[in-house]
């Protein structure tokens, strides 16, 4: 392995270990799992917050290395995987990062998202029930952040697309898609134009959106960070109840 690449991976590995150590130090209870006993609701809550903190750290990690960071983290917490699988965000964040690293749109129909609004697979007390009830509504902030991320992702591999087609791709109403694209243009998050005089394939009048393809890694990173942050806020609010 290239020495520089090894040092880079080691850096993310140590960062991930640091977050887990913070949880172990603050809780002092995670070691009981060594004897095979499952983590209780309080431990799950604390570990969930540690996982959320790890996600925040990805903002400072270059896009090409985000997935490596997460794979290191997941390998470190492997002994607690059975307990962590009860936390919706543990399944969701790797899916978000995987989609992000491959420039794919994040689909609300993905099983990881569906589990956010489904019943807990194992009853773990009021903490997990509170998480499920809070996330069931899918907050406006999470929906908005997902929409922004998906538009930024779409701008990286579309040059021209009709508004109706983009809306279908994003799974939102055309009016919402147009409003979101316009805001991102004004904010300079994406470089695009909206042509309201373009004729669509059916002969009607529609909007044609032209992307320049100049989306930066920083903008792409920021869109992922915002989405993870909103999901973390939602989960943390539920866990604090």
What are these regions (language model features)?
Residues 1-241:
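Charged, E/D/K/R/S-rich low-complexity terminal regions of large eukaryotic assembly subunits
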């Amino acid at each position: 392995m290239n020495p520089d690449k090894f040092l880079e991976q080691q850096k993310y590995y140590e960062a991930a270990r640091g977050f887990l150590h913070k949880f172990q130090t603050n809780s002092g209870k995670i070691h009981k799992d060594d004897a095979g006993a499952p983590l209780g609701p309080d431990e799950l809550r604390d570990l969930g917050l540690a996982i959320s903190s790890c996600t925040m750290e990805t903002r400072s990690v270059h896009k090409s290395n985000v997935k490596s960071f997460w794979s290191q983290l997941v390998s470190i917490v492997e002994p607690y995987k059975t307990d962590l699988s009860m936390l919706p965000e543990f399944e969701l964040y790797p899916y978000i990062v995987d989609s992000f690293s491959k420039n794919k749109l994040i689909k609300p129909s993905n099983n990881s998202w569906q589990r956010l609004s489904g019943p807990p697979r194992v009853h773990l007390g009021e903490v997990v029930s509170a998480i499920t009830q809070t996330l069931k509504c899918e907050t406006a902030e999470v929906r908005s952040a997902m929409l922004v991320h998906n538009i930024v992702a779409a701008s990286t591999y579309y040059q021209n697309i009709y508004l109706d087609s983009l809306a279908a791709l994003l799974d939102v109403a055309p009016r919402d898609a147009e409003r979101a694209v316009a805001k991102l243009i004004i904010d300079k998050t994406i470089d695009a134009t909206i042509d309201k005089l373009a004729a669509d394939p059916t002969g009607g009048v529609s909007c044609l959106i032209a992307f320049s393809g100049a989306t930066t890694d920083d903008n792409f990173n920021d869109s992922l960070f915002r989405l993870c942050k909103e999901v973390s806020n939602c989960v943390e609010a539920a866990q604090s109840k």
